[in-house]
Regions:
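Short amphipathic helix-loop junctions that connect adjacent transmembrane helices
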Residues: 49-90, 276-302
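A gly/Pro-rich, aromatic-decorated transmembrane alpha-helix motif that marks the paired
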Residues: 49, 107-108, 189-205
């Protein structure tokens, strides 16, 4: 019987390009992947920092909510489960649905990349969909379409670009763990910057400016990714035979997978709390925090940047 590890190693070698030397002795492709992911996370968290505030203060107000195509159907579906909701409660429910679905779609994005497309093409499509979604958020009528594009875009982008980081290294390369630390640092910096820029523009200048900044960030991320394609793992065609072999796990690997699956409820519970930073916390903070800073009315979204900065330190 064909050895699964041999097949996987052979496939990895066949999808690898000469990487050159980037920073700290890592392949040059890592720089492009980290920068692309950083800009994607900037766009993602920029939009997310504004979503509940935008819904509460603008879109769900009586003079605007009727302009959002299809939202009446969504509202009826939500209130059929929860009962009648206030504006703030409905905004929280919409955010919760989005935040829950956005963590499920990467599973489908990985399947699409492995079965039909390849990681490079799937990441590219995801970035384009996310950029379109951010720009469409600027218009009331296209709110639900924008959310749908963002969900699909994140699903295509997020997991697949992280997988490409691993593809830059052999399985036993000691630099691999450090590469993911650098990758996470890029994400952390984006989480700090996004509310400061998109949040400030959205709250102080206009909602469409904040969402537009998120869209521009995603376009920069896409351009960065495409500029670095020559340094990334080569994108071979989808290979069904290798995909079949990849499912033949050893007993030890199956135990590891089961252990990871068992951890999912715990991780999910922690995310419920973490996501409240972008949901109830913002609404509560806006009402209860003293946001004056040296005579300047500080945007409430800056609280998210402060929290992210403290987490990094």
């Amino acid at each position: 019987m064909t050895d699964t590890r041999t097949v996987a190693d052979s496939e990895a070698r066949s999808h690898t390009r000469p990487q050159g030397t980037g920073i700290l002795g890592h392949p040059r492709g890592l720089v492009y992947l980290c920068a692309s992911e950083g800009w994607e996370r900037f766009s993602y968290f920029g939009m997310q920092s504004l979503l509940v505030l935008y819904l509460t203060h603008y879109l769900l107000q009586p003079e605007h909510v009727g302009k959002a195509v299809g939202f009446a159907v969504v509202r009826r579906a939500i209130e059929a489960v929860t009962g009648p909701l206030s504006t703030a409660a409905l905004a929280s429910q919409v955010f919760g649905l989005y935040a829950g679905l956005v963590y499920l779609t990467p599973l489908l994005g990985g399947l699409v990349a492995d079965r039909w497309l390849n990681r490079t093409l799937t990441v590219t499509v995801g970035a384009m969909l996310m950029a379109a979604g951010h720009f469409l958020m600027a218009f009331e009528a296209t709110f639900l379409l924008a959310i749908a594009l963002l969900l699909v875009g994140v699903g295509c982008f997020k997991g697949n670009i992280a997988s490409q980081v691993g593809q830059l290294y052999a399985a036993d390369d000691p630099r691999r763990a450090q590469a993911y630390q650098i990758f996470q640092l890029a994400i952390a910096l984006a989480v700090i910057a996004a509310p400061l820029i998109s949040g400030t523009l959205g709250e102080k200048v206009g909602w469409h400016w904040g969402f537009g900044a998120a869209g521009v960030g995603m376009l920069v991320g896409l351009a960065t990714y495409l500029a670095g394609r020559k340094w990334l793992p080569s994108a071979g065609p989808s290979d069904r035979a290798n995909a079949e072999n990849a499912r033949r796990l050893t007993r030890s690997e199956r135990r590891t997978v089961l252990a990871l699956v068992a951890l999912l409820p715990v991780l999910g519970a922690t995310q419920v709390g973490n996501q409240q930073m972008f949901n109830a916390f913002l609404v509560w903070g806006e009402a209860n925090f003293e946001l004056q800073l040296a005579g300047f009315a500080m945007p409430v979204t800056w609280l998210l940047s402060a929290d992210a900065a403290i987490a990094v330190v």
